[in-house]
Regions:
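Helix-loop junctions on the cytosolic side of multi-pass membrane transporters
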Residues: 203-219, 409-417
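Helix-to-coil boundary motifs at intracellular loop junctions of multi-pass secondary transporters
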Residues: 54-55, 86-87, 145-149, 258-263, ...
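C-terminal ends and interior cores of transmembrane alpha-helices
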Residues: 99-117, 306-323
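Cytoplasmic membrane-interface "Motif A"-like loop-to-helix N-cap segments
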Residues: 85-100, 293-307
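Helix-loop boundary and gating motifs at the non-cytosolic
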Residues: 2-75, 234-273
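Substrate-agnostic recognition of the 12-TM MFS/MFS-like secondary transporter fold
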Residues: 28-46, 65-81, 97-101, 127-184, ...
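C-terminal transmembrane helical hairpin of 12-TM major facilitator-type secondary transporters
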Residues: 298-343
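Short hydrophobic/alpha-helical segments at membrane-entry points of transmembrane helices
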Residues: 28, 119-128, 237-238, 324-333
Length: 417
């Protein structure tokens, strides 16, 4: 079976793609699978949070991980999108971003071996900031490259298969942690180093794609952020709702902190949390997506409420002295990640349905810039409060999430025109 036939079978194509597309498709699946596996092995919400806590880093560094990763991947996108237009072959931005992520991940692994305490926190957070910026470059460039190398009816198969393969790998990693075969934090450092190697390999493989040259353009100006916000009240309210729901992304490290503070911080507990997170994604994403097609605002409202309930449940377990039990963190995290995926699905659906067709890219870039800024501010709030108590920071996030869910009910129902 040649490359074209194999890719046709994988993608379910009715017609066999040409040789170039078949080769590109297989290489994109392999490269994306490696990067998505890396994402799971280095997950800041769980893996890096656990590692920093095990290294004795102050809580402020642990709680800074998600804001650094998420905001760092959002804020530069407008600038990088402008730069992308000046490149004839846009695969190089993705390949370069993947290589830089790999080097940053290896830096995190080295820091985990060499440092402890606040020095480990500082070094790992700095390396994660570099990784986040590189991730932004990959995010901006991938759709451009895929649009030129894979036919429209086969693109979803590429990303879908890569996600499925990565999910299996992360579940296997979680199972190893649960099994007790891996006994110390060195196993987590090795996993982070493996993520770095996979990113390097993915970048090298992606650079071999056969990409048609694009017409080089002058870098366009940045979208008028203030004007865009001023002219559309629906966009302003949507950004406010999405901003109030950022605790769904920020809260997992606090659950890790409370679990380890009240328990023994065993690797098996980390494995259980990774498994719970993977199951939440697998079981809820499709359902949330279908519900968002009916009413994205109701999904945002429900997800905000679910997130608040999950955080309150963790606080109740913590104050009852049960947060360190082997089941508490994973069960609460499952509920929280179900809510997170609801927000993730509904925010995209609502923005696409709300925005005028000709302004969708502009609305998305403005929303991402605003949310990146809000993530940083929320992260600073959480970090400041966590120096006093991670529990009180989580309580604050529960209130904010509930407010976001309530405000979502006031959004216009865009799915019905």
């Amino acid at each position: 079976m040649n490359e074209e036939e194999l890719f046709a079978r994988i993608s379910g194509a009715e017609e066999t793609p040409d040789k170039r597309e078949g080769r590109n498709g297989l290489r994109e699946i392999a490269a994306l699978s490696m990067t998505k596996i890396s994402d799971g092995l280095i997950d800041p919400k769980l893996v890096l949070s656990w590692l920093l806590n095990a290294l004795g880093a102050p809580a402020a560094f642990v709680t800074a991980l998600v804001p650094i990763r998420e905001a760092g991947a959002l804020l530069p996108q407008m600038l990088l999108a402008a730069r992308l237009k000046t490149l004839a072959h846009r695969k190089w931005m993705w390949a370069g971003g993947s290589v830089l992520q790999g080097l940053a991940a290896l830096g995190i692994a080295a820091s985990g071996l060499a440092f402890e305490g606040w020095l480990a926190g500082l070094a790992i957070c700095a390396a994660l900031a570099v990784l986040a910026l590189a991730r932004a470059a990959c995010s901006v460039s991938f759709k451009e490259v895929q649009g030129k190398t894979i036919a429209k009816t086969r693109r979803g198969a590429v990303t879908g298969l890569a996600s499925s393969l990565a999910s299996v790998a992360v579940v296997l990693f979680a199972a190893l942690l649960l099994s007790g075969l891996l006994q110390d934090r060195g196993a987590v450092v090795i996993a982070v180093a493996l993520a770095g190697v996979l990113w390097l390999l993915a970048g090298a493989l992606f650079s071999t794609l056969s990409e048609p040259a694009s017409e080089v353009e002058d870098a366009p100006g940045l979208p008028p952020l203030r004007k865009t916000l001023a002219e559309d009240p629906d966009l302003r309210r949507f950004i406010a709702v999405r901003g109030l729901l950022v605790p769904t992304a920020l809260a997992p490290p606090y659950i890790v902190l409370l679990s380890q503070e009240d328990g023994e911080g065993l690797l098996g507990q980390l494995g259980a949390m990774l498994l719970a997170s993977a199951l939440a994604s697998f079981l809820s994403s499709y359902l949330w997506g279908r519900l968002a097609d009916r009413s994205a605002r109701m999904v945002l409202a429900a997800a905000g409420g679910c997130a608040a309930l999950a955080m309150v449940a963790m606080l109740a377990l913590y104050w009852a002295g049960m947060a360190g039990t082997v089941w508490a963190g994973p069960v609460v995290l499952f509920g929280l990640m179900v809510a997170y995926h609801g927000v993730w699905q509904a925010r995209s659906t609502y923005l696409v349905d709300m925005a005028p067709k000709e302004a969708r890219a502009r609305y998305a870039s403005v929303a991402n810039t605003m949310i990146g800024s809000i993530l940083l501010l929320a992260g600073l709030f959480g970090g400041a409060v966590s120096t006093l108590s991670a529990a009180w920071a989580l309580a604050g996030f529960a209130v904010i999430s509930a407010a976001g869910g309530a405000l979502a009910l006031t959004l216009r129902e865009v799915e019905r025109g």
